[in-house]
Amino acid sequence: MSFTLAIIGRPNVGKSTLFNRLVGQKLALVDDAPGVTRDRREGEGRLGDLNFTLIDTAGLDEGPKGSLTARMQEQTETAIELADALLFVFDARAGLTPNDRAFADFARRANKPVVLVANKSEGKSGEIGAMESYALGLGDPVQISAEHGEGMGELYDALRPLLPEPVEDEEDDEPADQSEEAIATRPIRVAIVGRPNAGKSTFINRLLGEERLLTSPEAGTTRDSIAVEVEWKGRDFRVFDTAGLRRRSRIEEKLEKLSVADALRAVRFAEVVVLMMDAQNRFEEQDLRIADLVEREGRALVIAVNKWDLIERQGGQIAQLRTDADHWLPQIKGVPIVATSGMLGEGVDRLMQAIQDAYAVWNRRVPTAALNRWFEQAISQNPPPAVSGRRLKLNYVTQTKARPPSFVVFCSRADAVPESYLRYLVNSLRGAFDLPGTPVRITLREKANPFAHKRKRKS
């Protein structure tokens, strides 16, 4: 049975640093500015033999009803409701503040086990601040330094009585090379990217049926890459909502730079990337840059044109979108395009099906016999050109891997094959085997000539 811990506390006391420490990887943004964590984030935490689900929350600042700050508070309250126990973190160096005391009252009202965590306890000032916390009436403080990993043993001792007995990790015996059946059943990792305020979080909330991610008219509401689990028609998906990707020249704040880097990491971690565009401002320069990044990273691509409900004359526009996509994105011809409305919930099923189809294409292996037939036909219809009076010879092709589909063509002079002919092979192969929206890699490799040495000796 899963045990859930929520890390709570006022802003900038080190909650995300502790989250990263326990999850074992840098999933949450960490910065000196208060309010860096806006959404609640979840991860699988481990401390010794203790395994648990960990929730990182926004700090509870009071704000006007309906404001972004107030909705951050609602997210935190929801996380507390979901948790089995609370890690109440305060800054021992700063000592107790009125907000900490108000927060302690809030934690007590939750009627759940509370572990009081005195973070930043290094040095004499940290020791004094930790002693002050007895006034909160929440028991002995656990003194730690999340940044340096100090006090984890003491935190283990405090958590051990709260958690059920540890069980053996059954995943250790899983083979490294997964079968086709495993690929067909494991969760598909999906990153939803796009320019700020394209409606990414609104769409995921519609998919989940709850306001899991903060949404706001102001661009840049999502700062972290938020991972959520989704089940659709019996298939599991792990969906990452990311910070909007802007042009680097417009990224001014350090925090926004961290957010963009976080989004780029999500793209690299994903298997399928959904590029979400605003229907009223589509195929702008930054959209094309993002699509190019996805192709270079070798990920399957699906384009979601969101806020489609705001388009008045929709007839024929999808066909025009496909034409525009092939024009602007020739390196990923045939990319699937789905019109959606996160606000109205339209296009959800179509997009999820497109993601699943794109994942299948990304994993595709072409049968050897069919690949050989295509290769012979392709070079017969359009033979490689002559270079310096000598015709290039392409010998044979083989698929080296999937994810994305990658091939090697063995030939006589690899460095002499024009880029235009390589593009011809890629587009021909993509069309022959129905590989839309996924990068197709063809590498040229010279085949050793066993008679070259003999000819040299004879001459």
Curated annotation (Swiss-Prot):
PROSITE patterns: G_ENGA. GO terms for biological process: ribosome biogenesis. It comes from the Bacteria. Residues 3-167, 188-363 form the EngA-type G domain. The keyword Phosphoprotein does not apply. One of its GO terms (molecular function) is GTP binding. Pfam families: KH_dom-like, MMR_HSR1. Residues 364-448 form the KH-like domain. The keyword Kinase does not apply. GTP 2 binds at residues 194-201, 241-245, 306-309. Keywords: GTP-binding, Nucleotide-binding, Repeat, Ribosome biogenesis. GTP 1 binds at residues 9-16, 56-60, 119-122. Belongs to the TRAFAC class TrmE-Era-EngA-EngB-Septin-like GTPase superfamily. EngA (Der) GTPase family. Associates with the 50S ribosomal subunit. GTPase that plays an essential role in the late steps of ribosome biogenesis. This is GTPase Der.
